[in-house]
A protein has these predicted regions:
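C-terminal alpha-helix
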Residues: 230-238
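Acidic/polar loop patches that form or flank catalytic/metal-binding clefts of enzymes
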Residues: 45-46, 118, 143, 156-159
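Active-site region of PLP-dependent enzymes
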Residues: 2-8, 15-131
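Conserved PLP cofactor-binding pocket of PLP-dependent enzymes
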Residues: 56-64, 105-109, 146-211
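Proline-centric
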Residues: 212-222
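Short, conserved charged micro-motifs
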Residues: 139-145, 220-226
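Short amphipathic alpha-helices in soluble, non-transmembrane regions
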Residues: 48, 143-152, 228-231
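Short beta-strand-to-loop capping motifs
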Residues: 39, 134-138, 215-217
Length: 239
């Protein structure tokens, strides 16, 4: 969701030696699946190019005659997915403009409630505005708001990561218990299982009070107003 965002004038994905973007169907721009690695370093480009295609060096037109300087894997994006991506990237500026407009309208509605605080953005001008992350005073209040939003049918698009099975470590029991389909190297297994004993209380305090609202490009002003008012009514009722 960070594609198109910037930090101090530099585009995200271009700040370090390499950057990555996912293009699955929930991202700001999508190919349906797949992603990219971006780099200005020729050595990283060549290694990434081979690593994602079984280790092929791509120096000729005969795949069977390619050399294999290292082991690679099949992480290629298909030509059909790439074609969708090329069409999408032409509209990225349009997507970002809509995202920012809809984000700002909804945030202004939520900001009516003094008990709500918002995620600190290190560079507001560079925010891609794909989500609004907002916070309530306590875990108990937040869970009550989530439950009431669910009861009223307005929870979809609002994510409580703290109770999510995938997006926050609290419920990653498969990782903490090293549940795999193949044997891990003992060193790697030990590092993985360390996660079960780590203290995430500081993160828990933040995440247990956070709800993230996804910003849709399809909303019109009336829909945003209606959505925001319903959310505000639920929050006020719980508070």
């Amino acid at each position: 969701q960070s594609i198109g965002g910037t930090y101090k004038g530099k585009h995200l994905g271009t700040i370090g030696d390499a950057g990555t973007f996912s293009f699955d169907f929930v991202k700001t721009m999508t190919c349906g699946e797949g992603g990219v690695i971006m780099t200005n370093r020729e050595d990283l480009y060549i290694k990434s190019d081979g690593y994602t295609d079984h280790g092929h060096d791509h120096k000729g037109v005969d795949r069977g005659a390619d050399l294999h300087p290292f082991i690679g894997y099949n992480y290629r994006i298909s030509e059909l997915h790439a074609a969708v991506g090329l069409a999408q990237i032409k509209r990225l500026d349009e997507f970002l403009s809509l995202q920012k407009k809809n984000h700002n309208q909804l945030k202004n509605i939520l900001a009516q409630i003094p008990a709500i605080s918002f995620r600190r953005i290190p560079d507001l001008a560079g925010d891609s505005c794909s989500f609004i992350s907002w916070f309530l005073p306590t875990e108990e209040i937040t869970k009550a708001v989530v439950a009431e939003m669910k009861a009223q049918g307005i929870l979809p698009g609002n994510f409580y990561w703290y109770d999510n099975n995938w997006h926050y470590i609290r419920k990653w029991d498969h990782l903490k218990n090293s549940v795999t389909l193949n044997s891990l190297h003992p060193e790697l297994k030990a590092r993985v299982m360390e996660q079960a004993n780590k203290d995430f209380s500081a993160s828990d305090d933040v995440m247990s009070r956070c709800i993230s609202t996804a910003i849709s490009l399809l909303w019109n002003e009336e829909q945003i107003q209606e959505k925001g008012e319903k959310m505000v009514n639920v929050i006020k009722a719980v508070l």
